[in-house]
Amino acid sequence: MMRPSYRSPKGAAVDKLDIPQGTLDLMILTILAREPMHGYGISQRLAVLSHDQFRVNPGSLFPSLYRLEEDGKLKADWRATENSRRAKYYRLTAAGRRQLEQHRERWDRVCFAVTSVLEGA
């Protein structure tokens, strides 16, 4: 199955997007709300769900994961992966689910406001 790719309104291919500041936590929490996952899996899922528009490098992803874990939003434990390697799997805590709801509500409001401005211009 081919995934759709984004093209500009004139049909030209476009470069991949930088993840907007402040949205990485929202995307991490959203992905982990579905199932526990290790860092590489989170990175891969993000690429798939964004139709390959977002690629997060480990230098951005892992500090966010560590901070979310330190803040009590995630819990982690070591497990064997599908190929028998050990990896740290992250899962949401109750505080993480609350944070996700708050982030999501705020993001929906931002999208509504930006869309309103763009359509009203």
Question: Where are the predicted features?
Answer:
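Amphipathic alpha-helical dimerization/coiled-coil segments
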Residues: M1-K10, R97-A121
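Short beta-strand/turn micro-motifs at beta-sheet edges
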Residues: V14-D18, W78-R79
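N-terminal helix-turn-helix DNA-binding core of bacterial DNA-binding proteins
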Residues: K16-S60
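A cross-family signal for key residues in well-ordered alpha-helices
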Residues: T30, Q44, Y66, E101, ...
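Basic amphipathic alpha-helical segments that dock to polyanions
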Residues: L61-L68
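Beta-hairpin "wing" of winged helix-turn-helix
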Residues: E69-R86, R91
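Accessory beta->alpha helical hairpin/"wing" motif in late/C-terminal subdomains of nucleic-acid enzymes
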Residues: L92-G96
